[in-house]
Amino acid sequence: MTTESKCPFSGGGKPNTPRRGPSNQDWWPNQLSLKPLHQHSSLSDPMDPDFDYAKAFNSLDLAAVKQDLHALMTDSQEWWPADFGHYGGLFIRMAWHSAGTYRIGDGRGGAGEGQQRFAPLNSWPDNVSLDKARRLLWPIKQKYGRKISWADLIVLTGNVALESMGFKTFGYAGGRADTWEPDDVYWGSEKIWLELSGGQNSRYSGDRDLEDPLAAVQMGLIYVNPEGPDGNPDPVAAARDIRETFARMAMNDEETVALIAGGHTFGKTHGAGPASHVGDDPETAGLERQGLGWQSSFGTGKGKDAITSGLEVTWTTTPTQWNHDFFKHLFEYEWELTQSPAGAHQWVAKDVGETIPDAFDPAKKQRPTMLTTDLSLRFDPAYEKISRRFYEHPDQLADAFSRAWYKLTHRDMGPRARYLGPEVPAEELIWQDPIPAVDHQLINDQDIADLKTSILTSGLPISVLVSTAWASASTFRGSDKRGGANGARIRLAPQKDWAINQPAQLAQTLAKLEDIQQAFNNAQSGNKRVSLADLIVLAGAAAVEQAAANAGHPVSVPFTPGRMDATQEQTDVDSFEAMEPVADGFRNYLERQFNIPAEALLVDKAQLLTLTAPEMTVLVGGLRVLNANVGQSQHGVLTQRPQALSNDFFVNLLDMGTTWKAAGEDGVFEGQDSQTGALKWTATRADLIFGSHSQLRALAEVYGSSDAQASFVYDFVAAWNKVMNLDRFDLA
C-alpha cells in the first residue's frame, strides 16, 4: 500500500457511462453545491411511500436469519472459496469496514445506511474483495427482502461470524434503513488512491496533523496503513496514526487495543502475488462483471491465489475459533521484518516453528506473522500496558472486545430509542448519550399557554429566547443522530461553555427559565412537571409566535412535550467536545477564518440538520430578522424592525438600491446606498450568498416578493419546528 503514482486496485479501464459534456462544476469549480441538501429523496427510494422499515424489521424472524447465516459461514462456494473452510474472517472485515468509516468530527460515515454498496466505498482499495462478501450474502438478503436492510444485514453477519467462531457478542440492534444512492461526503482532496502524505493534495500539514474531520491516513483506507505510515514499517510511528484515527472514531486506547487484537484473532490477509495482477475495481469493471471487481490473473485468482491488501498474514493457530494466540504470539515471540509474496512489509516470528495452518492445504503449516500495526500494541508504551493486561487476563480482553465491537457497529445509530430487535442489551452505555425516561405527567394545552405567558413576561427578549432554543436543538446531526434539544445538555459541560453559546448570557437565560420551571412544578399538586428541555423549546416557540404577531401575521408554533433532562453523569464530555460548532451560518458565527468559505460551511451545517435548500433559506432569513446572531452581531440583520418575523432580509438583500463592497474585515461586506454612498447594512458571505448564488437567489426571490410575507412566516415555522424535533425519535 505504498505506491503513490497509481494504485493497482484503481480503475484503469473505460467507465460504463455515456459521454457527456462538462458539468457546471467543471466550468465553475468554486461554485457552491447544494447537492448535499437534496440527497436521499423519495425520487431515489424504490419503497412504497408508506413503507415503515422499523415495522418490517420487527416482523422479521431474526433467529431464522441467524440460522441461515450460521449455515453460510461454512458453505464454501467454488467461485470464492472460504479461507479455512469458514467465511467468518471475511464477514468480520465486511462489517468492520462498513462501520469503520464513521468519524466523530461530523458524524458521517458508519454502517447506518449500507453505504458500502455504493461508490466510492465499494471501490476503495481497503475494501478489495468485500464485493464478494456481499454477493455471498445475496441469497439471504433475497430471501428476507425488505424485512432486513443491507445495512442491518451486514452488521448482523459480522456478529454471527463472531458467534459461529466461539465468541460471545455483547448484543445486536437493527434499525438501519438503507439509502439508495451514495452519500455526498468529503473523504479527502487527494486525486490518487492511497496518495502518500507528501503528495500534492495531502491531508496532512505541520507535524503530521490530520485534516479535520477526516479519520483515515490515506485516501481509500478505513483507518491506517497496516504497513506503517506511508508504508514505513515502524510500529511506534504507526501507533501514533492508530491512536489518532481511532480517537476520531470515538475509540479510546483500551477499545482500540481490544478491537485490533479481537479482530485479528480470526481469518487472514491476502497477498499471494504481485498487485499488478489485480484488475479494475467494481465501479470501473466491465458490465459483464456485474458489479464485481478486482478480477485477478494470478493463478486461479481466488482461494490460495487471492490478492486483497497485498499482505499475507495469519495471526493465530485457530483462525476460525476464538483463542488467546494474538497476545501470546505478540509477547512471547520476537519479530523480524520480511515481505509478503506481493512485496508488502510484514513481520514473521524469529526462531519459531511452523504452527499456523494454511488456509487451503491442511498438510501445510507456516510461521506466525503479524502486521506493523499489530506490533504497535507491544511497542507503544500506552498500548503495551493495556495489551499486557489483556495478555494476562483473557477474560478482560473478551469483555472489552465485545463492548468495543458493539460500539463500533452501533455508534452511528443514535439513542437507544432507535434500536430494534430482541438482542438489544439492557445495559445503557454512555456513548449512547442516554436520557432519562419520562417519569411524570406531561403539560397540557392550558399549561403550555400559561408557561408561554410566563416566558414572554420574564424580561428575556425574543432574540435571546430564539437563539437559546436554536443553540439547544441545532446540535443535532442527522449523520449519527446525536445532539438535539432532548436532554437539555446545553446546560451541562461542555455545551454550556462553548463560545458559540455565549456562556454568560446563556447562564442568565437558563437561570430565568429554571425559575419559571421551578415555579410551575412547585405549583402542581400531582405528578405533572415540565422539563427544562421542553421549556427551552417552548420558549423558542413563544418567541417565534410573538415575532410573527409583531410582523402582523399571528401564527401557532407546534409544540409536543416529552423531552427530559440528562445529567452530567450521563454526558461524555470528551465525546461532546467533538461536536462543538466552529461555524454556524444560521447564527452568522465563524470561530475563525477557514480555507472553506462560510457559505459552504452553512450548507454543511444545513445538511447535518437534514434541511433542504428552501428550509435553509427561510431559516437564515428568519433568524437574521429575529436578531439571533451570536453576540448580537448586526451582520445580515437587514431590517429596521428586529424581532419581527418579517421577510425584510430578502427584500433588502435584493434591493438594487444597495451596492455591496468588501470591507476591511475578512468575510464582511458593507451595503451602501447606491445614490449617496451612505452605509445601510453589513453582512457576511453567509448572507450575500442568497443574492449571489443563482439557485439561492431564486429561492430568495420567492420570499422577497410582495405577496410572500404570510408564506414566509408559515414556512419558517415549519422549518423551525422540524429542527426543534429532529431528535424526537419517540414521536416517530
From Swiss-Prot:
PROSITE patterns associated with the record: PEROXIDASE_1 (PS00435), PEROXIDASE_2 (PS00436), PEROXIDASE_4 (PS50873)
Crosslink position(s): Tryptophyl-tyrosyl-methioninium (Tyr-Met) (with W-96): Y223-M249
Similarity annotation: Belongs to the peroxidase family. Peroxidase/catalase subfamily.
PANTHER family reported for this sequence: CATALASE-PEROXIDASE, HYDROPEROXIDASE I, BIFUNCTIONAL CATALASE-PEROXIDASE
UniProt entry tagged with the keyword Metal-binding: yes
Span list, region Disordered: 1-29
Complex and partners: Homodimer or homotetramer.
UniProt keyword terms in alphabetical order: Heme, Hydrogen peroxide, Iron, Metal-binding, Oxidoreductase, Peroxidase
Catalytic activity: H2O2 + AH2 = A + 2 H2O; 2 H2O2 = O2 + 2 H2O
Function according to Swiss-Prot or TrEMBL: Bifunctional enzyme with both catalase and broad-spectrum peroxidase activity.
The protein's name in its UniProt record: Catalase-peroxidase
Residues of the site described as Transition state stabilizer: R93
Active site (UniProt): H97 (proton acceptor)
Cofactor(s) listed: heme b
Gene Ontology cellular component list: cytosol
GO annotation terms (biological process): cellular response to hydrogen peroxide; hydrogen peroxide catabolic process
